[in-house]
């Protein structure tokens, strides 16, 4: 019977073992990359010597464990196989694809934007793509150390959760290099060769996020805005490398003043033969008919100059905003419903470097194929959620009804709010947004879960010494966590403007809006003990320990306990799978004996 059992077990193992494809990114590898399965090492190979992306096959049962070994050093954790191929994994990152980050709800569905491409895996927030730029060493060094305005040809490789795409002869360079107050961690841009696209886009921009210790605000803003049914730019955090040198974590996004964004978000990759006029709004871009339109800078490919915006501005200025019919008629030449949604977001986040407060960092698109209809474009969401906010602390309590007086330059929104019907729509959007998404109960769980998922990459980013000239705040890894709940001061020469914690701002703004609009507080919480999300990495559970004060200290304690609990649970995962296997085998033996 013992020999029979042994034979049965061997048969079952043979039947259920499968050839598995392993895929791992290992930028630090110098000599070898291997996968370790029960002590058996299998060599993995890179198909392109420029890209540290290694693949290979080995036999393994579904649910069994494995780990990667680079230059003889093994990962300190076990991975569990799920399927016959791994996703594109990253050496020493325990979580490849997040499964515990809550999904933000879609709101304001009536009239929501449906024309754009937002489904490509490159924008999947549960995965951190890796971007590799390969160019001539002297040219790449020129960009990094001299921050030149030159652009160079380079090979760009995008690695998403499942696929890898490499495109040759891309044009690569810095975004607005050499400015006096630039940060040492630069912002980069590249264009793909004509006729080539990734995620239906041909132009990419990655922003350094250096003003924000958490590195979450800018993407969070865009994510919420799209959940509100707008055509806000797509965004995702990426790891970025130049000639295999790690440059850090960046926010990869659509640049809304480029036709790549218009093609993707307005036409789903199938633009009309004649595209419309596209503008970048600099300081003073208010759409003021009594002035000029010179603050709107046309894209170099725009078929119309800035004066083409004047007919819209004059038509808007001529509206009697006490007349509902005239206001409704605006929608024939301006999508003001989308504009109202963007203004709700500006108000909630104190987006001081945007349209309502400063009449800057906006833009416009004139759709010549749709009766020259004007679309407002929102961009650059880094100065939000209290970052660099030059206002008194109680500014967070300012109701939106005070904004037209406080910020008279925002002509479009201020005039629209003069109409009772439009004002009611704005207020409805504001109420719905606060009740369903912009509240501490929803964003607290979402933001902390995202931080925990990204923690190993944030720690890596904070360890990198930037080689470009510029401001260095010196935000620490610990501050990427602390600034979720409280203000922090940078240890570098520049102290930074992170006087508000991200969730601290959310909670304060939620409370203020609920009070001013007399909304119930059934879904509201404080930035304290109820904010907890399970940690997804050792760094999230062990390194996120700080001397937080008041409510933040409670949050820290709760989060770290959750992290510890999750860490223990993850360590017991192999035991769980082992028990499942034993149960499965015992049932299989029972069935086999019927036929022996």
UniProtKB/Swiss-Prot annotation:
InterPro entries according to UniProt: Ig-like_fold (IPR013783), Spore_coat_CotH_CotH2/3/7 (IPR014867)
Residues lipid-modified (GPI-anchor amidated serine): 567
A single GO molecular function term of this UniProt record: host cell surface receptor binding
Protein's UniProt keywords contain Lipoprotein: yes
Broad class of the protein's primary localization: membrane
GO biological process, one term: adhesion of symbiont to host epithelial cell
Annotated Gene Ontology cellular component terms: plasma membrane; side of membrane
Position of the signal peptide: 1-17
Subcellular location: Cell membrane
Region (Disordered) residue spans: 528-557
Glycosylation sites recorded in the entry for this protein: 82, 146, 163, 169, 288, 440, 544
Topology term for the membrane: Lipid-anchor; GPI-anchor
Low complexity: compositionally biased ranges: 528-544
KW rRNA-binding (keyword) present: no
Superkingdom per UniProt: Eukaryota
Propeptide, residue positions: 568-596
Assigned keywords, A-Z: Cell membrane, Glycoprotein, GPI-anchor, Lipoprotein, Membrane, Signal, Virulence
Disruption-associated phenotype: RNAi-mediated knockdown decreases invasion of human alveolar epithelial cells.
Subunit structure as annotated in this protein's UniProt entry: Interacts with host integrin beta-1 ITGB1 on the cell surface of host alveolar epithelial cells.
Stated role: Promotes invasion of host epithelial cells by adhering to receptors on the host cell surface to facilitate endocytosis of the pathogen into host cells. Probably binds integrin ITGA3:ITGB1 via ITGB1, on the cell surface of host alveolar epithelial cells.
Protein name: Invasin CotH7
Organism for this UniProt entry: Rhizopus delemar (strain RA 99-880 / ATCC MYA-4621 / FGSC 9543 / NRRL 43880) (Mucormycosis agent)
Higher taxonomy: Eukaryota, Fungi, Fungi incertae sedis, Mucoromycota, Mucoromycotina
């Amino acid at each position: 019977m013992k020999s029979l059992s042994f034979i049965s077990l061997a048969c079952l193992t043979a039947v259920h073992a499968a050839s598995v494809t392993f895929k791992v990114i290992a930028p630090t590898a110098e000599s070898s990359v291997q996968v370790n399965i029960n002590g058996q090492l299998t060599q993995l190979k890179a198909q392109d010597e420029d890209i540290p992306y290694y693949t290979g096959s080995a036999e393994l049962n579904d649910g069994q464990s494995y780990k990667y070994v680079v230059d003889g050093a093994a990962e300190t954790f076990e991975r569990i196989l799920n399927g016959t191929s791994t996703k594109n994994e990253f050496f020493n990152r325990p979580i490849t694809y997040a499964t515990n980050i809550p999904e933000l709800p879609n709101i304001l569905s009536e009239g929501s934007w449906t024309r754009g491409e937002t489904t490509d895996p490159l924008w999947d927030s549960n995965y951190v793509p890796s971007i590799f730029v390969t160019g001539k060493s002297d040219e790449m060094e020129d960009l990094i150390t001299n921050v030149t305005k030159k652009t160079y040809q380079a090979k760009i490789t995008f690695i998403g959760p499942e696929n890898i795409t490499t495109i040759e002869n891309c044009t690569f360079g810095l975004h607005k290099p050499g400015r006096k107050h630039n940060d040492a961690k630069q912002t980069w841009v590249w264009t793909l060769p004509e006729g080539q696209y990734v995620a239906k886009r041909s132009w990419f921009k990655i922003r350094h996020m250096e003003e924000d210790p958490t590195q979450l605000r800018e993407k969070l803003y865009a994510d919420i805005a799209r959940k509100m049914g707008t055509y806000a730019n797509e965004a995702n955090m990426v790891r970025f490398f130049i000639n295999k040198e790690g440059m850090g974590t960046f926010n990869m996004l659509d640049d809304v003043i480029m036709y790549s964004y218009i093609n993707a978000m307005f036409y789903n990759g199938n633009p009309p033969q004649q595209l419309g006029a596209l503008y970048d709004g600099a300081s003073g871009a208010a759409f003021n008919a009594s002035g000029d339109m010179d603050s709107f800078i046309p894209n170099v490919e725009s078929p119309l100059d800035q004066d083409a915006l004047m007919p819209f501005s004059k038509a808007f200025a001529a509206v009697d905003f006490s007349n509902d019919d005239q206001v409704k008629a605006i929608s024939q030449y301006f999508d003001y419903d989308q504009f109202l949604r963007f203004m709700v977001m500006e108000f909630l986040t104190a987006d001081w470097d945007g349209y309502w407060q400063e009449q800057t960092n906006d833009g416009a698109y004139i759709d010549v194929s749709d009766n020259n209809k004007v679309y407002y474009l929102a961009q650059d969401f880094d100065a939000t959620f209290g970052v660099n906010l030059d206002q008194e602390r109680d500014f967070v309590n300012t109701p939106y009804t005070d904004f037209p007086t406080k910020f008279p330059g925002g002509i479009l929104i201020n005039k629209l709010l003069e109409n009772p019907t439009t004002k009611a729509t704005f207020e409805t959007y504001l109420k719905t947004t606060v009740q369903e998404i912009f509240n501490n109960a929803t964003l607290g769980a979402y933001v902390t879960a995202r931080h925990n998922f990204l923690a190993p990459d944030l720690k890596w980013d904070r360890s990198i010494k930037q080689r470009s000239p510029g401001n260095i705040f010196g935000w620490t890894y610990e501050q990427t966590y602390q600034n979720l709940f409280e203000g922090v001061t940078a240890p570098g020469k520049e102290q930074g403007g992170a006087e508000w914690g991200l969730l601290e701002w959310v909670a304060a703004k939620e409370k203020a809006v609920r009070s001013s609009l007399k909304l119930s507080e059934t879904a509201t919480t404080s930035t304290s003990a109820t904010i907890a999300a399970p940690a997804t990495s050792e760094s999230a559970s062990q390194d996120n320990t700080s001397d937080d004060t008041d409510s933040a200290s409670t949050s820290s304690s709760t989060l770290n306990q959750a992290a510890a609990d999750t860490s223990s649970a993850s360590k017991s995962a192999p035991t769980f799978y082992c028990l499942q296997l034993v149960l499965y085998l015992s049932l299989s033996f029972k069935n086999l004996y019927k036929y022996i």
